[in-house]
Each structure stands twice: as structure tokens, then as C-alpha cells.
Amino acid sequence: MNLRDEFERIMREQREIALATMSEGLPHVRIVNFYYDTEKHCVYFATFKDNEKVVELAANPSIAFTTVPHNNTTEHVRASGHAVKSARPITAITEAIVAKAPRFQETVDAVGDDLIPYEITLTEAVVLIGRDHWSRIVF
């Protein structure tokens, strides 16, 4: 089993990440839709510009996340890094996120101007396929 291939598959198939930010020494976790760019090793997500997440990330861009398993599996990816506002417009990531989470299009259509795209550049991640199948991969 090639765990790098499994990483790519999980990032392609799973629709959401549980994203953890920090504020005043406390973690805050939210579920967000995401898109993973295999060439740039970047995770993209969007949030509303008036969301507390924006304030938290401006004060401390350090994050951690885990993909949210689906289809009765426990396989997932977990990673940490820094989330920064993306130079890409929301329109640049919409199609890729909608391919995984079709209802995201409704949000973009209704309030796209209020969404800020963020990116997380990965340097390493842990891939967990099962209790005995896991590995740390470095990009």
C-alpha cells in the first residue's frame, strides 16, 4: 500500500475538514469544505469575512486539521500548518469545492462577495488508513 497515494485519494474523496484555530489559549474547531491542490500541496477553504475565524487567523495563523471520514470508514488525514488569506479569488476555488460539496455553489451564488479564500501549505501530514496502517508523509 502506497500511503502517498492513499493520502491523495483521501484528500480527493473527503469533503470536509475539522479545522482548529486558537484564540486566547483555547482551541476552536469548525467543519469546513475544502479543496486540495495536488501540485501546490495546498488546502483551500473559504469563510465569511465577518466570521470569528478571520479574527483568530489574523492573530494566530497556526492551525491543525483532520479530514472528516465518511462512508463508515475511519481513514483520515491530519496535519498542522498556517492558514493565510489566499491571493486567489473565491472564483478560483469554487469549482473544485463544488465538485466535492455541490451545495457550496448556493453559498457562493448568494454571498460570494462575503467569502474569503484561505490556503494552508502542507509540509507534512499523517495518513491513517487503519490501526496498523499509518504513516507521516513529508512534501
Regions found by a protein language model. Give the residues of each.
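Charged, amphipathic alpha-helical segments
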Residues: M1-D5, D50-K53, A101-R103
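Extreme N-terminal tail/first-helix region
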Residues: M1-I17
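Alpha-helix boundary recognition
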Residues: M11-R12, A58-A59, V98
